[in-house]
A protein has these predicted regions:
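Conserved alpha/beta core surface patches that mediate binding of polyanionic ligands
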Residues: 1-11, 74-80
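A structural signal for short hydrophobic beta-strand segments in well-ordered beta-sheet cores
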Residues: 12-14, 86
């Protein structure tokens, strides 16, 4: 009960790779101990299999705070590797429980393609992917740029972005765990320059802005 703070299982989060079909189950609990975890996992895998669903990984996420935020900071892998893979714009991405990933796969591919085309990249540009998450926009642009720099405050997402670049053989991308606004200011003061900046979500202060949003207003 979220209002009273009682009970064990707060949420059950499902993620599925659109192109790979891989399935992740995230059990969000109010405490670290999940009684009968091994038997529960075994039963879940069995029942899912009967329905023709092959679960790739099961993760326990612990959120002991009194909040409406779904996921907490502590995680424990109960089955599999703790992540699933999916393909987007010709590249493969590892998705962990807290990774941000666009829900509408088809439209995301169209959107990213349009964004890269609108940037008129020639292969000579330094591209900054601000608020980069797991690196999907930056790595999509990497094939058309001299260098890509991604900045993201979520350290887990940056870890995924670095792994995604390595997995896809992208050698012209670097990722930093930092507040993007602050990092940009410090980089500019140090004399670093970017030819193109992708900002998702967009920010004020740009002289030329290609605005993309799931609900543009």
């Amino acid at each position: 009960n979220e209002d009273k703070g009682t009970g064990l299982l707060r949420h059950c989060l499902l993620r599925r790779g659109v192109m790979t079909g891989q399935v992740m189950v995230v059990l969000v609990t109010a405490q670290p101990v999940l009684p009968g975890a091994k038997n529960f996992v075994k039963a879940l895998l069995t029942e899912a299999g009967k329905q023709g669903v092959a679960i790739t990984t099961i993760v326990q996420n612990v959120n002991d705070r009194k909040t409406s935020v779904v996921l907490g900071d502590m995680e424990k892998v109960l089955y599999g590797k703790g992540f699933i893979l999916d393909e987007l714009c010709g590249k493969t991405y590892a998705l962990s429980p807290r990774s941000f990933y666009q829900i509408n796969h088809t439209q995301t591919e169209v959107l990213y393609g349009l964004a890269v085309d609108a940037a008129h990249l020639t292969g000579k540009e330094v591209v900054l992917d601000a608020y980069c998450g797991i690196g999907t926009i930056g790595l999509t642009a990497a094939d058309h740029a001299k260098q890509v720099v991604g900045v993201e405050v979520n350290r887990e997402a940056v870890h995924d972005a670095i792994g995604n670049a390595k997995h896809n053989g992208v050698k012209n991308a670097r990722f930093f765990a930092a507040d993007a606004t602050r990092w940009i200011g410090e980089a500019a003061a140090a004399g670093e320059r970017a030819d193109v900046i992708f900002m998702d979500p967009p920010r004020e202060g740009s002289t030329c802005l290609l605005y993309t949003s799931p609900s543009p207003r």
